[in-house]
């Protein structure tokens, strides 16, 4: 019994001593751990804390939850100044039919909101994306007379918000806008168009928001490589003004103005040059024998139809306006010249027929030389045909009876060329050509070109 007691006592004492030794050894091992491992452990703990706390610190720095941002800065006081500057990236298109233009640019707003001020020892600004825009006040700028507009969203929405410690804010957007341009086509295609993009606050009138160009005339910047296929950009300028609405009052308005001058070379090749060619081609009929009815009529009809096609093509590419354009003046005057060349031959043909009938009546041969079939044949091809009368006995007296007797030759005007070759070439061919030319054709060869040249001088002098 005594032996069992002592055995239990020594066992308890040994276990107690072992536990005390392990408790003393563990702190010693902790103390023996390397300083490097201690620093790594502390760094990890610090990073975990920063990841959890940093977003909360930014919200606290800007005091987002402590203010009501549904109202403008300085509500109830003077209007908040909002500066604007624009960097034009490109003018994508100009549409004459729709009377609009499409422009891509960077729009930057500058204002001060003391509710967003925060303490900073380095005086560095903080940059945010679009998510903060929904929580604070921003200017409600819109584009007057715009048809379509959107903010670019590749790869993310192109919105940037930068807040400075003193509360100054920069709000930047990349936007594409299609807006109206009230064009005047009275001088088209020798025209110059003045277009403008207008910016204005939608809700805040002059008592609440003052819109101005941040850097004056230098607030509007453009890329040097901007170019258009049909226009040359002469000038970019910035201006400002006030707009009045009867129901809400006066509003500040900013203008992005640009002047477009059309490239004329394209239209010279596509419109003016073909019209000139058709007019000059119509003059060829003045040099064709007046008895060659099919040749002159077909040439006149071809030039008239071609001019009609050119006029239709020009009108199809233009808006339907109620006034006369410069290109309309040129096209219709050119069409008039082509049409008059056809009328000129109709007059020549009629007068020639009347003159020949008078000559035949004076000689008393109308009954013997011209039967019904011969008259119909002459009306068809402009040549006299008679199978019963000897052709060598036929003579035409075109100017006077005395001249006709002097220049009488064998055969009709449409006789075979071999008959003419049998005549003496000592001036007879030239005399025959002169006798076949009507006086109207002779004058038309001079009058038509001279008048058309005078018209071109006046036209280009007025419109260019």
From Swiss-Prot:
Coiled-coil boundaries: none
Location of the region described as Interaction with SQSTM1 in the Swiss-Prot/TrEMBL record: 344-445
GO terms classed as biological process: chloride transmembrane transport
Signal peptide: 1-15
Listed name of the protein: Gamma-aminobutyric acid receptor subunit rho-3
Transmembrane segments: 264-284, 297-317, 329-349, 444-464
Gene3D superfamilies xrefs: Neurotransmitter-gated ion-channel ligand-binding domain, Neurotransmitter-gated ion-channel transmembrane domain
Membrane topology (Extracellular): 16-263, 318-328
Cytoplasmic side of membrane: 285-296, 350-443
Disulphide bridges, residue numbers: 181-195
Binding site for 4-aminobutanoate: 108, 172, 200
Family, similarity comment: Belongs to the ligand-gated ion channel (TC 1.A.9) family. Gamma-aminobutyric acid receptor (TC 1.A.9.5) subfamily. GABRR3 sub-subfamily.
Known role: Rho subunit of the pentameric ligand-gated chloride channels responsible for mediating the effects of gamma-aminobutyric acid (GABA), the major inhibitory neurotransmitter in the brain. Rho-containing GABA-gated chloride channels are a subclass of GABA(A) receptors (GABAARs) entirely composed of rho subunits, where GABA molecules bind at the rho intersubunit interfaces. When activated by GABA, rho-GABAARs selectively allow the flow of chloride anions across the cell membrane down their electrochemical gradient.
Any one GO cellular component localisation term in the record: postsynaptic membrane
């Amino acid at each position: 019994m005594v032996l069992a007691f002592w055995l239990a006592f020594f066992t308890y004492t040994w276990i107690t001593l072992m536990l005390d030794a392990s408790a003393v050894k563990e702190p010693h091992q902790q103390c023996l751990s390397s300083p490097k491992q201690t620093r790594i452990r502390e760094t990890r703990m610090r990073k975990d804390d920063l990841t959890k706390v940093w977003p909360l610190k930014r919200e606290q720095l800007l005091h987002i939850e402590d203010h009501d941002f549904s109202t403008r800065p300085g509500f109830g006081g003077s209007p908040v100044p909002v500066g604007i500057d624009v960097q034009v990236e490109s003018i994508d298109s100009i549409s004459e039919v729709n009377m609009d233009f499409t422009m891509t640019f960077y729009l930057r707003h500058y204002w001060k909101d003391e509710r967003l001020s925060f303490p900073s020892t380095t005086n560095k600004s903080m940059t945010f994306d679009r998510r903060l825009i929904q929580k604070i006040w921003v200017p409600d700028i819109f584009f007057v007379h715009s048809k379509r507009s959107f903010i670019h969203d590749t790869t993310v929405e192109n919105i940037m918000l930068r807040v400075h410690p003193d509360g100054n804010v920069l709000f930047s957007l990349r936007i594409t806008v299609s807006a109206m341009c009230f064009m005047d086509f009275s001088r088209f295609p020798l025209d110059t168009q003045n277009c403008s993009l207008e910016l204005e606050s939608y809700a805040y009138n002059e008592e609440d928001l003052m819109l101005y160009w941040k850097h004056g005339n230098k607030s509007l910047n453009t890329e040097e490589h901007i170019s258009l296929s049909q226009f040359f950009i002469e000038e970019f300028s910035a201006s400002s003004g006030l707009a009045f609405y009867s129901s809400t009052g006066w509003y500040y308005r900013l203008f992005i103005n640009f002047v477009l001058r059309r490239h004329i070379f394209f239209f010279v090749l596509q419109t003016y040059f073909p019209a000139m060619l058709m007019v000059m081609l119509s003059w060829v009929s003045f040099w064709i024998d007046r008895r060659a009815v099919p040749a002159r009529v077909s040439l006149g009809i071809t030039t008239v139809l071609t001019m009609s096609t050119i006029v239709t093509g020009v009108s199809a590419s233009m808006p339907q306006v109620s006034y006369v354009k410069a290109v309309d003046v040129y096209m219709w005057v050119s069409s008039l010249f082509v049409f008059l060349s056809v009328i000129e031959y109709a007059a020549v043909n009629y007068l020639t027929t009347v003159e020949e009938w008078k000559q035949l009546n004076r000689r008393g041969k109308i009954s013997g030389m011209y039967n019904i079939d011969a008259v119909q044949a002459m009306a068809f091809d402009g040549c006299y045909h008679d199978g019963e009368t000897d052709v060598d006995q036929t003579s035409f007296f075109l100017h006077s009876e005395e001249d006709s007797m002097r220049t009488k030759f064998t055969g009709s005007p449409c006789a075979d060329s071999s008959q003419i070759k049998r005549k003496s070439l000592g001036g007879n061919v030239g005399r025959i050509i002169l006798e076949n030319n009507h006086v109207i054709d002779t004058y038309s060869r001079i009058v038509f070109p001279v008048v058309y040249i005078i018209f071109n001088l006046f036209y280009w002098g007025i419109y260019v």
